[in-house]
């Protein structure tokens, strides 16, 4: 697990000057980057810094309005409960993901209910009654403010078509204004920090010269400030860092092939077990997956691999999620499940396969799958066309569409963990927990076996199809529940798998038959976070904050990704500001170039994972860690 020396991966703390970082081409922002830019623009309209917290309902309401939302009091109360003391910028982003902006069509549909003459207008008396007596009631003054809008009112009538157009135009103008303000502030910050590079550095995969050795190791952002310039209170408020430390890692295109994963000799003679599983992306961006127990009966050489599962039936057109990184952390159980010791992880790679080879003693091991979140992430792009799931023939009988049956077949392939072509109760229950939050008990499973096609007391693929058809029939053809199932499994309205990544684990043992069983489906945190921190602390490059020996930044680099961990040995919490603005051809799991993390006393935390945006080109990781408090 030690990091091997490599000629194309170097650690330094040197900073590139602007003249050394020419930008040759601008790349369009991704939907994800546009989303975060809009979030940041709205947040900074209300606060001086994204490090400030929302501390009241009024602030939350105002920030949501600037983000183009029109939250009701019910919505505000959902996110600001009696137990809420504060919300940070990350919380704000999560809320915006869940609360979609009101569309023009939705507004028109709401007003049209009151349009008795179907002429695009509503009588002021009807509008007044509706707004003051229905739903979340408005005050007389609030209604009068609407009625007094000259552009949309005339002759005692409210022109709701004009109002909707005005509403959408105003929203767009507000967003444009906040984005323009953000760009002005960003240019000012780049100017004051000596960085005149335009655009988003993460979007430029072009090679850049290596950092000049003339720049000193420690970076003090205050030395770059134009001290005579008082235009930005944001800079003076948040950029006075106590100390900083930086890392640079330069990686060649396609990684370093010296560490390529190799199969052991005579592996065909080893005993083999396999299990499938899946990473699922939650609404808040958290990733959950199956977790496993593995039993090794006697000391043996073991070869472990994990890779994304290809479901494509079209030759030459693999499943799009094959680019998602996967890893497997192996922990040994000592006396109890609570006492797990990190043994190794699959750091070697051959294309989409990640693996590890070594000797394991007899015992129980936990296999915890991991993905960085750099590539398995929320897709902001909306899907306009909804796939049809069911149809009726000329007799009125309900059937599943060909497209939906194909999707169900893929889902069956994913949840059939042992790959025997059948679903056991245990396998089916992982599916039920994911889609409904409940388990199927023995009695319900017996009923299922009586009514649907089974083999050896396990559900067949056809039985699984018929089970979903029954669900559609129970709802008289309404596909609502079917869509809940599909969304839970990571599919969008076009039946594309965009928020999940199925994978397959292979275990080979030389001297015994290994056993593997899926036992949980949990968030990729907790034990996994501890395992990642321990592996990075053991194998990474460590740098101490100058003057603060209790704060250490650890950075681990392999051919595929870079992980940083912050260790706080002090008795107080610290806030660390992270800037990736000078990184090239990089993407991180947080989706932000600049962010801050709070590290509790006597604790370690994973700060970020970074991967190349384009693996076929060189990528440069340049990150500055600064102590705020």
Swiss-Prot record:
Signal peptide segment: none
Annotated compartments: Cell projection, Cilium membrane
Pfam families assigned: EF-hand_7
Record keyword DNA repair present: no
Residues where Ca(2+) binds: 416, 418, 420, 427
Cited PROSITE patterns: EF_HAND_1, EF_HAND_2
GO annotation, biological process: positive regulation of protein import into nucleus; positive regulation of protein localization to ciliary membrane; positive regulation of transcription by RNA polymerase II; protein localization to motile cilium; regulation of smoothened signaling pathway
Entry keywords, A to Z: Calcium, Cell membrane, Cell projection, Membrane, Metal-binding, Phosphoprotein, Repeat
Quaternary structure and partners: Component of the EvC complex composed of EFCAB7, IQCE, EVC2 and EVC; built from two subcomplexes, EVC2:EVC and EFCAB7:IQCE. Interacts (via EF-hand 1 and 2) with IQCE (via N-terminus); this interaction anchors the EVC-EVC2 complex in a signaling microdomain at the base of cilia and stimulates the Hedgehog (Hh) pathway. Interacts with EVC2 (via N-terminal end). Interacts with EVC.
Name of the molecule in the record: EF-hand calcium-binding domain-containing protein 7
Organism of provenance: Homo sapiens (Human)
Gene: EFCAB7
């Amino acid at each position: 697990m030690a990091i091997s020396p490599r000629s194309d991966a170097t650690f330094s703390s040197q900073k590139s000057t602007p003249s050394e970082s020419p930008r040759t081409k601008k790349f369009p922002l991704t939907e994800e980057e546009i989303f975060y830019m809009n979030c940041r623009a709205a947040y900074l309209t209300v606060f001086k810094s994204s490090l400030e917290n929302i501390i009241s309902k009024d602030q939350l309401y105002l920030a949501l309005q600037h983000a183009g939302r029109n939250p009701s009091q019910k919505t505000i109360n959902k996110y600001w409960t009696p137990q809420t003391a504060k919300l940070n910028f990350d919380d704000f982003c999560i809320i915006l993901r869940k609360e979609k902006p009101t569309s023009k069509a939705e507004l028109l549909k709401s007003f049209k209910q009151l349009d008795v003459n179907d002429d695009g207008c509503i009588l002021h008396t009807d509008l007044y009654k509706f707004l003051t007596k229905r739903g979340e009631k408005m005050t007389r003054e609030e209604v009068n403010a609407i009625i007094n809008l000259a552009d949309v009112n005339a002759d005692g009538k409210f022109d709701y078509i004009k109002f909707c157009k005005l509403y959408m135009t105003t929203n767009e103008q507000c967003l444009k204004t906040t984005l323009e303000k953000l760009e002005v502030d960003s240019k000012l910050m780049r100017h004051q920090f000596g960085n005149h590079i335009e655009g988003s550095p993460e979007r430029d995969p072009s090679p850049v010269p290596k950092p000049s050795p003339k720049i000193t190791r420690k970076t003090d952002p205050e030395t770059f400030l134009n001290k005579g310039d008082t235009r930005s209170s944001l800079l003076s408020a948040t950029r006075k860092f106590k100390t900083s430390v930086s890392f640079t890692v330069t990686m060649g295109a396609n990684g370093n092939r010296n560490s390529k994963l190799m199969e052991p000799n005579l592996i065909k003679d080893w005993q083999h077990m396999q299990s499938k599983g899946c990473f699922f992306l939650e609404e808040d961006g958290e990733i959950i997956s199956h977790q496993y127990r593995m039993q090794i009966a006697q000391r043996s050489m073991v070869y472990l691999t994990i890779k994304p599962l290809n479901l494509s039936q079209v030759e030459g057109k693999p499943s799009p999620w094959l680019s998602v990184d996967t890893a497997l952390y192996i922990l040994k159980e000592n006396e109890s499940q609570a006492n797990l010791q990190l043994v190794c992880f699959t750091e070697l790679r051959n294309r989409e396969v990640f693996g590890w080879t070594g000797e394991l003693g007899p015992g129980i091991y936990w296999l915890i799958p991991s993905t960085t979140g750099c590539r398995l992430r929320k897709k902001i792009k909306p899907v306009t066309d909804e796939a049809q799931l069911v149809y009726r023939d000329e007799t009125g009988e309900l059937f599943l569409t060909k497209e939906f049956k194909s999707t169900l077949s893929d889902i069956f392939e994913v949840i059939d963990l042992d790959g025997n072509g059948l679903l056991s109760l245990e396998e089916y229950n992982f599916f039920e927990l994911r889609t409904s939050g409940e388990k199927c008990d023995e009695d319900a499973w017996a009923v299922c076996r009586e009514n649907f096609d089974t083999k050896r007391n396990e559900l067949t693929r056809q039985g699984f199809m018929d089970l979903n058809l029954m669900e559609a029939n129970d709802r008289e053809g309404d596909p609502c529940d079917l869509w809940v199932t599909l969304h839970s499994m990571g599919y969008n309205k076009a039946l594309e798998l965009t928020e999940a990544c199925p994978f397959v684990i292979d275990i080979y043992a030389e001297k015994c038959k290994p056993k593997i069983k899926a036992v949980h489906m949990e968030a990729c945190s907790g034990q996994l976070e501890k395992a990642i921190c321990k592996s990075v602390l053991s194998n990474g490059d460590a740098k101490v904050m100058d003057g603060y020996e209790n704060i250490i930044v650890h950075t681990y680099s392999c051919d595929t990704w870079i992980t940083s961990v912050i260790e706080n040995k002090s008795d107080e919490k610290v806030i660390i500001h992270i800037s990736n603005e000078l990184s090239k051809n990089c993407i991180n799991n947080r989706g932000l170039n600049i962010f801050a993390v709070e590290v509790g006393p006597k604790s370690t935390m994973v700060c970020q994972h970074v991967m190349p945006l384009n693996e076929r080109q060189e990528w440069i990781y340049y990150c500055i860690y600064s102590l705020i408090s």
